[in-house]
A protein has these predicted regions:
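Short, flexible active-site loops
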Residues: 51-62
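Solvent-exposed coil/turn segments that connect beta secondary-structure elements
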Residues: 44-48, 90, 122-125, 165-167
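Extracytoplasmic/luminal low-complexity segments enriched in Pro/Gly and acidic/polar residues
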Residues: 123-180
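Juxtamembrane "stalk/linker" segments
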Residues: 1-43, 49-52
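Short, charge-rich amphipathic segments
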Residues: 1-14, 62-66, 136-150
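Soluble extracytoplasmic domains of inner/organellar membrane proteins
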Residues: 60-134
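A generic local secondary-structure boundary/capping motif
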Residues: 28-31, 74, 107-109, 150-151
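Envelope-exposed proteins and targeting segments
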Residues: 2, 35-39, 43, 81-83, ...
Length: 180
């Protein structure tokens, strides 16, 4: 009986250790939701003026948010130590996330989004704001904001929420075809 109890106690500690390791992996993989203070950055295409016009010297490319604009914001936030980032209302970014512009839309995790592009980041708001202010691509984008009317807002939040990543984590497994 004593041997059974010892074995059971050892099993309990192994289960506890496995659960702790699983929790660490889940956090690193971004599958758990995160809440906390941070920033919300919104990027929008240019709007027409009161007369329905854009600036005369603007080309169509000057008036829309591009992939490098989104990447500039994301890289600044990550470099400042963001704990978790999501785009739009439901797309948690993880190591394998690659937002891509397709025409005037953004493709992320197999879904297509139109502006405004809303980026929520959990972390030290002061550090992330400083990183945004110092990032060359964000500085260039803000010049286009001033010149062509693109949209750029940064708001602070004390209780922001970032969803957990919902898609499969990690690469799939290749299986060779029979007879080839």
């Amino acid at each position: 009986m004593a041997a059974a109890r010892e074995q059971s106690a050892g099993g309990d500690s192994q289960v506890a250790a496995a659960l702790a390791e699983t929790a660490e992996v889940a956090d690193a993989a971004g599958v758990r939701p995160v809440t906390g203070p941070g920033l919300v950055v919104t990027l929008t295409d240019a709007k027409r003026d009161a007369y329905g016009r854009f600036p005369r010297d603007a080309s169509p490319d000057d008036l829309v948010v591009h992939q490098q604009d989104v990447e500039g914001v994301l890289n600044a936030l990550w470099s400042a130590g963001a704990e978790a980032i999501q785009m739009q209302d439901d797309q948690r970014l993880v190591a394998s996330s690659v937002p891509r512009c397709v025409g005037n839309t953004l493709l992320l995790h197999g879904r297509t989004y139109s502006p405004p592009y809303v980026i929520t980041a959990i972390g030290d708001a002061d550090a992330m704001q400083a990183a945004l202010d110092a990032a060359p691509l964000v500085t260039l984008y803000r010049q286009y904001v001033a010149r062509f009317g693109l949209g750029y807002t940064v708001t602070r939040g004390h209780h922001l929420e970032v969803a957990g990543y919902r898609d499969a984590v990690g690469p799939g497994r290749a299986v060779p075809l029979q007879g080839h």
